[in-house]
Design a protein with these regions (language model features):
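Secretory-pathway/membrane protein signature
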Residues: 1-233
Length: 233
């Protein structure tokens, strides 16, 4: 059937890119090589085919994970230490609050809203778009836009290790830990500002213990993806 013919055509081209080019991170020569193959194929059916360059920061989007783990782990440790070093409670808790605010800012902006807030802190690369246009045979009434991506992604370990049964609880517990540590540091700072020493506050002690218990979860989340293993597909 015609549907099977087109499906086989798509499968053959995908297989060709995977075998001929292989793994291709965004902004690499391998990605461009794949795009050139696609451009040549598109020239057989389209009127205009162009390859346009643009700049990007390929490591920025997933960078919020490492940054968040560092900031929140440090904040949890500082909260814990404030109980044993009450004289340094203000700087410890103040820095801890600042770190969790920084972490939450990048989680919300980079991960939830796809804002490029981490781009200035990561390496810049040049990627490309393949733009193909097929002109109408008559009057233009509608435009159909089909888009995709030519690069291949880093391996998401959690997907292989356990699929949704591991991905969802790991991210969920990790985010609960981030929010709990943020609230704990802020509450502890308010208690200290109110005149209570961290050494005398059972609330600060309990909050610090719970926050520290989340640290193994934070470090486990660092294994979410493997930057050294890139997919072919």
């Amino acid at each position: 059937s015609e549907r099977r013919m087109y499906a086989n055509y798509v499968a053959r081209n995908i297989k060709n890119v995977c075998k001929t080019v292989g793994p291709r991170c965004a902004g690499t020569e391998k990605e461009l090589e794949a795009q050139k193959l696609m451009a040549e194929e598109l020239k057989t059916t389209c009127d205009d085919v162009n390859i346009e360059s643009f700049s990007l920061h390929p490591r920025a989007f997933m960078g919020w994970i490492q940054l968040t783990v560092f900031c929140v782990t440090a904040a949890a440790v500082m909260l814990f230490l404030s109980h044993f070093f009450p004289a340094a409670a203000y700087p410890l808790l103040g820095i801890g609050v600042a770190l969790v605010v920084i972490a939450l800012f990048f989680v919300i902006s980079e991960f939830l809203f796809y804002k490029e807030t981490l781009d200035p802190f990561t390496k810049k690369s040049t990627s490309h778009n393949v733009v193909a246009v097929r002109k109408p045979s008559g009057e233009t009434k509608r435009r159909i836009i089909v888009s995709g991506h030519a690069d291949s992604a880093m391996e998401w370990r959690f997907t292989y290790w356990g699929g949704p049964k591991l991905v969802v609880p790991s991210i969920g517990i990790g985010m609960i830990g981030v929010l709990f540590t943020a609230v704990a540091d802020i509450v502890a700072l308010i208690i200290v500002i109110g005149g209570t020493s961290p050494a005398d506050s059972k609330a600060i002690w309990v909050l610090s213990i719970i926050s520290v218990c989340f640290i193994p979860v934070f470090f486990f989340c660092l294994l979410f993806f493997d930057p050294k293993r890139i997919f072919e597909g």
